[in-house]
């Protein structure tokens, strides 16, 4: 907007004064007399984190990340952005700060991680894979040819790489390349009744059942307020690739991918390990809660896990996690919700691939590319696995993320 002249130098000066971020009169004069352009000034201040996305309230400015223990469902990290400083609200509440929190356009009091229902995009294809395998519509060795346009329904959806084709794919390679056509076929086959007629509602009921079994279509279980997840109620063919009316918060996505990483063991998520009294005596120990077990054969789970591993090796996220030593399995997803705003992006997965320890979900609204949640998770996991330190993160320059993911 600055570069295109939609915002004047005076708008920029007003912005930084309002936010209290204009460091000196010298900078003020440089902006006024043109010694530094507003565009270069804003870019410099964003890279130094003097001005943050939340301050601008321009897309993308909100997102969330959740990391869980695959073997227990315990939440290891839950981050929402924009956020606020708890210290300013502890004991004595700073009234000016409280007023600002309630009136800021970026809504820092809104918990994006637990309440922002966001379309999942192609991350939903893991659910469709499980449903298709469990109900015997496909098996790990079923190959479907990507005919690009799915003409069994009108209007006909297409594979995102149209006019190109993924060719013959099975569940593993369909996940690797995020082949829409493969999942269109499953969403359609689930809806065929005994007479061979397509009934979308029949398929949607199956998809909803497995979304709930996987922990996606039910609340996560965290001990704070969360929104009710929404599984799509329209068009099973498009729902099968994550479109339709699907809407999930990051904690819902985290429980879902934790279940996949745990080969079907659906743990309720929890933020609490134990409760102690003032003398450090444990008065409550919160044990893992298993809600259900999704029944697939070992070969079927292996096929899904292989597909997720291929995503980060040769698929839609192949160029991104190269700086991470730990082996990653995951799935990318982008989703359009508003024609006038950028797409949402998500990445879900687990690590290490060989023996899952943690699973994770990151969703950034209106950021357009899965490279952004991917980069966020890459750096977070490098820290978790001890490959970089806190100081490394804090001292690193803020640069553009390396875009390597496809939008699908």
Residue ranges and their predicted role:
Residues 1-42, 46, 53-365, 407-408:
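Beta-lactam-recognizing serine transpeptidase/beta-lactamase-like catalytic domain environment
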Residues 253, 369-378:
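Short, charged, low-complexity patches
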Residues 281-283, 289, 376-408:
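Short, gly/Ser/Thr-rich active-site loops of penicillin-recognizing serine hydrolases
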């Amino acid at each position: 907007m600055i570069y295109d002249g939609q915002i004047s130098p005076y708008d920029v000066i007003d912005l930084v004064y309002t936010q209290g971020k204009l460091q000196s009169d010298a900078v003020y004069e440089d902006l006024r007399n043109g010694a530094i352009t507003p565009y270069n000034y804003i870019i410099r201040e964003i890279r130094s984190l003097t001005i943050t996305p939340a301050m601008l309230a321009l897309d993308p400015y909100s997102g969330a990340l959740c990391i869980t223990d695959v073997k227990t469902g315990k939440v290891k990290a839950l981050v929402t952005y924009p956020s606020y400083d708890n210290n300013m609200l502890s004991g004595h509440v700073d009234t000016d700060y409280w007023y600002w929190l309630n009136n800021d356009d970026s809504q820092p009091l809104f918990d994006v991680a637990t309440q922002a229902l966001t379309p999942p995009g192609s991350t939903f294809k893991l659910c469709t894979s499980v449903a298709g395998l469990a109900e015997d519509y496909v098996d790990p060795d079923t190959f479907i040819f990507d005919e690009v346009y799915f003409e069994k329904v009108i209007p006909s959806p297409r594979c995102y790489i149209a006019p190109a084709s993924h060719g013959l794919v099975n569940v593993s390679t369909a996940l690797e390349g995020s082949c829409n056509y493969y999942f269109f076929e499953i969403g359609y086959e689930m809806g065929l009744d005994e007479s061979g007629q397509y009934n979308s509602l029949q398929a949607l009921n199956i998809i909803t059942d497995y979304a709930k079994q996987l922990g996606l279509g039910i609340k996560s279980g965290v001990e704070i307020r969360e929104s009710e997840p929404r599984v799509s109620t329209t068009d099973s063919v498009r729902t099968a690739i994550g479109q339709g009316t699907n809407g999930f918060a990051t904690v819902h996505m985290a429980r879902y991918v934790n279940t996949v990483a745990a080969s079907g063991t659906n743990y309720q998520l929890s933020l609490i390990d134990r409760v102690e009294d003032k003398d450090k005596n444990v008065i409550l120990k919160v044990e893992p809660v298993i809600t259900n077990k999704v029944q697939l054969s070992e070969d079927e789970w292996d096929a899904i896990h292989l597909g997720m591993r291929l995503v980060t090796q040769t698929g839609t996220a192949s160029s991104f996690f190269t700086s991470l030593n730990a082996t990653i399995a995951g799935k990318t997803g982008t989703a359009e919700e508003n024609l006038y705003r950028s797409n949402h992006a998500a990445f879900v997965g687990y690590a290490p691939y060989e023996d899952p320890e943690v699973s994770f979900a990151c969703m950034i609204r209106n950021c357009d590319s899965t490279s952004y949640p991917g980069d966020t998770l890459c750096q977070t996991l490098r820290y978790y696995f001890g490959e970089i330190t806190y100081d490394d993160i804090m001292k690193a320059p803020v640069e553009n993320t390396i875009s390597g993911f496809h939008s699908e």
